[in-house]
Amino acid sequence: MTFYLFGIRSFPKLWKSNPYLGLGPGHSYVSLFLSDSCGIRSQQRLFSLKTMSPQNTKATNLIAKARYLRKEEGSNKQVSSVPHFFSAGAAKKRSQMNPQSKDHALPSVRNTIQLPTQPLNSEEWDKLKADFKGKTSFERFIISQMAHSHSSVDVAKSLLAWVAAKNNGIVSYDLLVGYLYLCVFHMQTSEVIDVFEIMKTRYKTLEPGGYSLLIQGLIHSDRWRESLLLLEDIKKVITPSKKNYNDCIQGALLHQDINTAWNLYQELLGHDFVPMLETLKAFFDFGKDIKDDNYSNKLLDILSYLRNNQLYPGESFAHSIKTWFESVPGKQWKGQFTTVQKSGQCLGCGKTIESIQLSPEEYEFLKGRIMRDVIDGGDQYKKTTPQELKRFENFVKSCPPFDIVIDGLNVAKMFPKARESQVLLNVVSQLAKQNLRLLVLGRKHMLRQSFQWRKDEMAEVQKQASCFFADNISKDDPFLLYATLHSGNHCRFITKDLMRDHKACLPDAKTQRLFFKWQQGHQLAIINGFPGSKLTFQHILSYDTVVQTTGDSWHIPYDEDVVERYSYEVPTKWLCLHQKT
């Protein structure tokens, strides 16, 4: 029998009166096709589908001397081509230079079924199901793959009509939500409203994914305020997600309800959520048509929020910020996209970007927090004993302040083909020639004669640097942080470790930002060299990559669309805004 369903309004005729159909709200299967809608991107698909057609001067000088290889060695070009350790995209490039073996990756599960591109009748759906060889439910598999492939609403509608005809009018909740997802994706607002009416009749409550889809679909209609009621329904069970707030804010701005949008934004912040950048962008997009000082001040508060939480707008958001500034009447703002020189000077306006170095007050604050929260209170991040840590503290206090602290085991493994003790000795020897006070942190096994560790080379290391060898079960990071901070703001450290665990151990955004700022200003990276050759250290950034203003100028670092930036990296592109004089 040929069965096409051209209107969702005819669905109730196919269903029985029981309000709880199929699996019911909350079934975990719904998450399979809600990933995009709820702000979670799926990077892997289980099936492959085919579509059918119908300060210390010595330490400072070291940095200056080690920024580049000697000109006579002809290596300036080589050094300049290496991305900075903390620059956006640097980790991606390092991973490409050192690809990991993929020989043991599990093959993805594949199914040869082809998704239809046109609505099917009952006989055609019957045949497609008969050809299906998967172990899961055919209907669930099809609707999930339709969602992933963003199939047309009409094709999904024919699936639901076929299911209803085969099951005495019963359509399971997960199939209905899958259909709703496609309606939302294709912005079929009238269909969303029809599904909304059915769900109100059939279900007393929904699971969060269903609510989220309805909110997202309703905000584009003249019934957008009902999305606010759905938000209240979510609050009765759980805290709404920042995606829920984002959609409601977008709906309020779309329909010119500014007060509701700002109230929702404050409510979002009250939950300690970090707003989605598209939420903040929406305020700037709306603001270019608003000539109101109060609204303008709130947008400037958003920029301060970006600064305080070390957030970076994307390229599109940066364009929205630029457009808004240039639209403010009487202020004569002019924006341009630019970069910052290594000296910290903006190439756009010539102003100097804020220094990466912490103020004395910031340094003492951070030092106290790290000592308390990471060294003394961070047991979950270290493997050592209180006795050994105390022994180390006494050792450090008995020594003059160090200029450089070296993670010995980490540095020794930087060149895998070389003997580890030889690598460490080479690094220590070259630094010792600069008359720097060095501390090498290591493990006791490094002192035992072995293929990787020669006693004579380690004895030479101990002649040129102070050394502390911890138990083999200990972790070096707490020792490295303690020694570096105790030595003073001039002290640098060498390790490839990015210290993300320690940053996460800190209690608030302010302390985490200060830690990352301190790390960028003190961590030395070896970017060139091998045993017996001259080492090259990457320059330490002189400026802080953070949103900043001088009153008559703003400098806003932003993410390029084409660059993949890891959380411990910073953008290299800037939006420069200044007032014409």
UniProtKB/Swiss-Prot annotation:
GO-annotated molecular function: metal ion binding; ribonuclease P activity
Main localization of the protein described in the UniProt heading: mitochondrion
Swiss-Prot/TrEMBL catalytic activity: Endonucleolytic cleavage of RNA, removing 5'-extranucleotides from tRNA precursor
Binding sites annotated in the UniProt record for Zn(2+): 346, 349, 555, 576
Top-level taxon of the source organism: Eukaryota
Post-translational modification: Degraded by LONP1 following mitochondrial unfolded protein response, probably leading to inhibit translation in mitochondrion.
One of the Pfam families matching this protein, by short name: PRORP
Enzyme class: hydrolase
Obligatory cofactor(s): Mg(2+); Mn(2+)
Binding site for Mg(2+) 2: 477, 497
Transit peptide feature range: 1-46
Record keywords, A-Z: Hydrolase, Magnesium, Manganese, Metal-binding, Mitochondrion, Nuclease, Transit peptide, tRNA processing, Zinc
Subcellular compartments: Mitochondrion
GO biological process, one term: tRNA 5'-leader removal
Record GO cellular component, one term: mitochondrial ribonuclease P complex
Cofactor note: Binds 2 Mg(2+) or Mg(2+) ions per subunit.
Location of the PRORP domain: 340-576
Residues the record lists as binding Mg(2+) 1: 407, 476
UniProt domain comment: Displays a distorted and non-productive active site that probably switches to a fully productive state only upon association with TRMT10C/MRPP1, HSD17B10/MRPP2 and pre-tRNA substrate.
Subunit structure: Catalytic component of mitochondrial ribonuclease P, a complex composed of TRMT10C/MRPP1, HSD17B10/MRPP2 and PRORP/MRPP3.
Name of the protein this chain belongs to: Mitochondrial ribonuclease P catalytic subunit
